[in-house]
């Protein structure tokens, strides 16, 4: 069937992480969302304390990185799927390959 995979993050989460929602476009059934990526590595802010995420750059708000991943962007190249995302409160950009999406 026709399925939409929606990747997003939620301002206010602690830590803000990348979520995925699966929507069947034939029936408009929505599966529950699941966390697919959260800050673990040092460069993602993984060892920093938990804070409630807020809009905007953490450099402007806190003077440096925070424990947050946000703003996912999906793209395809050579039949491979990738996700770009901002990390550490918009202090950098991460890249991750996506495997097995939509597989049973």
Segments the model singles out, each with a brief description of its role:
Residues 1-104:
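Carbohydrate-active catalytic/glycan-binding domains of CAZyme proteins
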């Amino acid at each position: 069937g026709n399925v939409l995979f929606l990747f997003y993050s939620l301002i206010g989460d602690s830590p803000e992480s990348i979520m995925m929602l699966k929507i069947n476009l034939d029936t408009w059934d929505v599966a529950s969302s699941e966390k697919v990526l959260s800050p673990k590595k040092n460069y993602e802010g993984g060892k920093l304390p938990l804070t409630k995420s807020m809009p905007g750059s953490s450099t402007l708000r806190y003077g440096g990185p925070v424990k947050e991943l946000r703003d996912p962007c999906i793209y395809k190249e050579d039949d491979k799927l990738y996700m770009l995302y901002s990390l550490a409160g918009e202090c950098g950009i991460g890249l991750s390959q996506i495997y097995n999406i939509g597989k049973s």
